[in-house]
C-alpha cells in the first residue's frame, strides 16, 4: 500500500492526538491525582502534573501539524494551501513567543487559544481551495462546529463535570466533514473544458479507422477483384 493510501490513517491519528491532547491538558491532572491517591494514598508530585499539562499541549500541537500535513499532501500542487499552512505556523510561533513572556502562561498555558486563531486565519485559504458553493458552505459549517465544540461546549462540560455530553461527538463530526470535503481533490481544469486524452488512448481508439495501416486478408482481395 502506497503512502497516499495511508493518509486516512494519519488523518485519524492527527484527530486522535488533538482529542488526546485536550483530554490530557484539562483532565489529565485530575485523573492522575485520583489514581495516585487511590494507589499510594499521597498527593501527586508537582513535576508529574506539569508533565501532564505539557504532554497534552505537545499532543495537541502534533495533531494539528499532522492534519495540516495530510491536507497538504492531498493538494500538494496548491500554492494557496501551502501558503496558508506556512502562515499558520508563523502565527502560532509568534503568538507563543508573545504569550510566553506573561506570568500566567506558566500556570495556565494558552496554546489551545492559538489553534482557534489558526482555524479562523485558515478559513479564507480553505474556502479558496474549492470552486463549488456547496463545498464552501460545508467548510464554513465544519469550522464553526469545531470551534463551537472545542471552545464552548467542551469547556462548559468540564466546568460543570458533564461526562456524557455532545462536545466530543461535535468535534469528531466537524473533522469528519472536513475530511469528506477534502478527500476528493479539485479538478485541475475548469468545468466544461475538454481534457485531452493520453496519446496511447487516442492510438487505441483511432486504430480501427487507420485503413492504410490495416492489413487486408487475401480472401477479401479476391472478392474485390
UniProtKB/Swiss-Prot annotation:
Membrane topology, as annotated: Multi-pass membrane protein
Principal location class: host cell
Transmembrane segment boundaries: 2-22, 53-73, 80-100, 111-131, 136-156, 162-182
Alphabetically ordered keywords of this record: Host membrane, Membrane, Transmembrane, Transmembrane helix
One GO cellular component term: membrane
Location(s), subcellular: Host membrane
Protein name (Swiss-Prot/TrEMBL): Transmembrane protein 022L
UniProt organism field: Invertebrate iridescent virus 3
